[in-house]
Swiss-Prot record:
Recorded family membership: Belongs to the universal ribosomal protein uS7 family.
Record text on subunit structure and interactions: Part of the 30S ribosomal subunit. Contacts proteins S9 and S11.
Domain of life: Bacteria
Name recorded for this polypeptide: Small ribosomal subunit protein uS7
Cellular component terms per the entry's GO annotation: small ribosomal subunit
Length: 157
């Protein structure tokens, strides 16, 4: 990792159907081995299921609501001081909050065995939108860990 200068953030192209960079990011998180077409089918199928179940209109707005409930504000990073390693709580940027929330939603969906991925993804989005489920629990666990290690906040770098 070069320390000369920060890498330039590249713009994610909006997806074809919803014209949203957020949906394109979700597709990229789901994609494995370059199979973008399959990832798009999974995401669009999940959005159709979410629209059917919640009947609230635009699935992108529902995804935004789910992300708002799943987005962590703090996380802990290991910091070695002397011979001891401390878990230091730090605030995280909006981009990282969004990326973590999307990754957690996809991981929780793939953890639901026995049902197709598009249905699992739809269920996770609905659970996160309703402030329940594995993703919200993971966020709360992360916040609890940061709260428990608040005494080491002065070691922030």
């Amino acid at each position: 990792m070069s320390r000369r200068h920060r890498a330039v953030k590249r713009q994610v192209e909006p997806d074809i159907r919803y014209k949203s960079p957020l949906v394109a990011h979700l597709v990229n998180v789901i994609m494995k081995s370059g199979k973008k077409n399959l990832a798009q089918r999974i995401v669009y199928g999940a959005f159709e299921k979410v629209s059917e179940k919640l009947e609230k209109g635009d699935p992108v707005d529902l995804l935004l609501g789910a992300l708002e409930n799943a987005r962590p504000r703090l996380e802990v990073k290991s910091r070695r001081v002397g011979g001891a390693t401390y878990q230091v709580p730090i605030e995280i940027s909006f981009e990282r909050q969004e990326s973590l929330a999307l990754r957690w939603i996809v991981d929780a969906a793939s953890g639901r065995k026995g049902i197709p991925m598009k249905e699992a993804l739809a269920a996770e989005i609905i659970d996160a939108y309703n402030n329940t489920g594995n993703v919200v629990k993971k966020k709360e666990d992360t916040h609890k860990m940061a709260q428990a290690n608040r005494a080491f906040a002065h070691l922030r770098w």
